[in-house]
């Protein structure tokens, strides 16, 4: 039987050939929890009477949404995960001593391996498909079941193959590719499907761009996003202390897909997702014509807080100043990224431009802290969601964009095209 990469990964884990639509129980290689969702999993774990994790080394807790904690409630919530991690002597517990947003930190630590089946109690767990793994978000109770048994059940998803061809223009990145897909198919256009990204454009993308694309697969309703391993993937993995041996799977010629989409990116401009859906994409040229003044610009998150994003922003901000009526917040996705940015002089460029640089955290993206929007404020952001009230007051607006557009907009005080600078 001809199989997709997703069908092959599940077949390997189940020990028999499976196909899309089948209900299976699969071994889980890595379970990911965070400070918001893990306490619920812990409660269910303890309620079940379980005393031991099925696979302690395959469980990671990352304190990232409120780190350091912002108030008494978040401090008490963090305490639950912290005490559980100490009680079970978790090797993969990450807090203030080694901070990072989970979906940037785990690949950095070598905890995501090609061929894995990964679940996390966070919808953007699909990020890790960029490394040729099946990775998806699940509920906290599903996480608890996997903590106890080391397994979970799935319906093997059908796949949508997206083939990108052409050549990217300057300041068009992976973020623009995924926003364009979502614009074309809508927020439910890939419901419970595996979005498989391929083509000559993908072959030339950096890992950072690939992570951005897979991260936002969920915004099209997808169960997962996935990119087959190639030389760029292998180069990324080369210096990682991988917890296990990787397995490389590739879709067969003639494998069955729900649909195949072909997208020519040759004339694609940077894409801006207008409020209040990631599918509300428009060209940056349209946004410039709309003359949209901004109160806040944000660069960070598990979508676009990586080193390449900071480098792109620094190139644009160097020698410039953030507009008087605009504030720019920059949040590196991990401590390693923050340190690298500091060594390269990027942090100095940001501060001299008038930006504030925070520690790694999810904070602003979910409207938690470190960048909450007030009434009627408008923000251009490298994050992944622009729903009503996502980053603050229900009357505020979020426009999603790549890091170059956000940096250029911070200087202009309104949404701007970095190619015009």
Where does each model-flagged region fall?
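Fe-S-dependent hydro-lyases/dehydratases of central metabolism
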Residues: 1-421
